[in-house]
């Protein structure tokens, strides 16, 4: 199904918990800064995803909080795995990934994105308020070993991390990961000074790239290949390309459909109607109707 702007819905991002075992100073918790309603069950998530198939969803991204904190995560993946879903991926901080990678693969998970903003153990502990970077690296190694690939490393470009980019690039090249450089969205005024314009970084990488590809169904995002390393950029801020080619809707952990990454004022309740026995397809239609580009030309 297309929205009013001709954008086909293809992807569904599921935030399955607000909880996290780290406390990164920049975290916006997928746009939900407070714990609100009841956590959805694995069965409810499965039913909502199943309804989304009618509207064109073929890719699922699972996130949080930290999704590996949900002990029923393999069950959730099993519920949503079917022949119509072409790709199920998960974004994690990687702390628990070594322990659960094989179970997730067995349940039907295809691949993972692991957040990693620095390779410096001291800086990592400072950014995450106590995280152990060695646990993350072991988790990445295990994920690659069991076949949760292509693995992507999510690098958040901030004033305090950009100096780590060359080392991160070398690390990703060495382990065979794709590097995703993400623009920092400051959700609070006191964090604005951490924002870094990633356009010059992208221009520099584009200049030195061996090959450049365009991902048509991912906001026309460019993929650069430089010395064997694949690099992508995610630039949501003031980016008309990002918005005009967006194919994703989102589900909050407490059961609200979220039409836009950058808005939290037009959520559509779907969990409570489901619990009341309603046909939830009309709520998907409402969500898709609410979609409009946040950044317009």
From Swiss-Prot:
Reactions it catalyzes: GTP + AH2 + S-adenosyl-L-methionine = (8S)-3',8-cyclo-7,8-dihydroguanosine 5'-triphosphate + 5'-deoxyadenosine + L-methionine + A + H(+)
Family annotation (SUPFAM superfamilies): Radical SAM enzymes
Domain of life: Archaea
EC numbers, comma separated: 4.1.99.22
This protein's name: Probable GTP 3',8-cyclase
Family annotation (PROSITE patterns): RADICAL_SAM
Signal peptide as annotated in the record: none
Pathway: Cofactor biosynthesis; molybdopterin biosynthesis
Entries under PANTHER family matching the protein: MOLYBDENUM COFACTOR BIOSYNTHESIS PROTEIN 1 (PTHR22960:SF0), MOLYBDOPTERIN COFACTOR SYNTHESIS PROTEIN A (PTHR22960)
Keywords linked to the UniProt accession: 4Fe-4S, GTP-binding, Iron, Iron-sulfur, Lyase, Metal-binding, Molybdenum cofactor biosynthesis, Nucleotide-binding, S-adenosyl-L-methionine
Record organism: Methanococcus maripaludis (strain DSM 14266 / JCM 13030 / NBRC 101832 / S2 / LL)
Residues annotated to bind [4Fe-4S] cluster 1: 20, 24, 27
Cofactor: [4Fe-4S] cluster
Keyword presence, Iron: yes
Residues that, per the record, bind GTP: 13, 61, 91, 152, 248-250
Function: Catalyzes the cyclization of GTP to (8S)-3',8-cyclo-7,8-dihydroguanosine 5'-triphosphate.
Any single GO BP term: Mo-molybdopterin cofactor biosynthetic process
Enzyme type, top EC level: lyase
Binding residue positions for S-adenosyl-L-methionine: 26, 65, 115
Database matches in InterPro entries: Aldolase_TIM, Elp3/MiaA/NifB-like_rSAM, MoaA_arc, MoaA_twitch, MoCo_biosynth_MoaA/MoaC, rSAM
